[in-house]
Amino acid sequence: MKVLSIDFGTKRVGLAISDPDQIFAFPYKVMERTTRDAMFSELLEIIENEKVGDIVIGLPLSLDGEDTLTTRQVRNFAASLERRVDLPIHLVDERLSSIAAEDELKEAGLWDRKRKKNLDSQAAKIILETWLARA
């Protein structure tokens, strides 16, 4: 089964997905945050359509490993999602994933506007690659 990775942000939610063998990670899409219900509805549809078996969520710890306000928001989001799906949810340290994502997009030659549009799904891909390497 596939693994869905989520980079949860205040404005956008980046998604990445693995292949069924859980070897490769691919950027999937960027969801604009609207209402909480709309966000969960779209996520549940993706989970069902893509036959997702595990969910990985990036946990934004501070550089010294401490929880921040955003960390608590992500933990609340993960708990809300856990109540809606019967799948394992894994929290993965995402420190510096956005910086690594931006570097990858620059290396791919994407110009600024296109890079910004794809940054969140690329960060989700890096989070997923981290999890797949450990699994």
Curated annotation (Swiss-Prot):
Single GO cellular component term: cytosol
Coiled coil feature spans: none
One GO-annotated biological process of the protein: rRNA 5'-end processing
Record bears the keyword Transferase: no
Enzyme class: hydrolase
InterPro entries tied to this protein: RNaseH-like_sf, YqgF, YqgF/RNaseH-like_dom, YqgF/RNaseH-like_dom_sf
SUPFAM superfamilies: Ribonuclease H-like
Pfam families from the UniProt entry: RuvX
GO MF annotation terms: nuclease activity
EC nos: 3.1.-.-
CDD domains with a match to the protein in the record: YqgF
UniProt subcellular location: Cytoplasm
Keywords carried by this UniProt record: Cytoplasm, Hydrolase, Nuclease, Ribosome biogenesis
Predominant place of localization: cytoplasm
Family: Belongs to the YqgF nuclease family.
PANTHER family noted in UniProt: POLYNUCLEOTIDYL TRANSFERASE, RIBONUCLEASE H-LIKE SUPERFAMILY PROTEIN (PTHR33317:SF4)
Function: Could be a nuclease involved in processing of the 5'-end of pre-16S rRNA.
Protein name from the UniProt record: Putative pre-16S rRNA nuclease
Species this chain originates from: Maridesulfovibrio salexigens (strain ATCC 14822 / DSM 2638 / NCIMB 8403 / VKM B-1763) (Desulfovibrio salexigens)
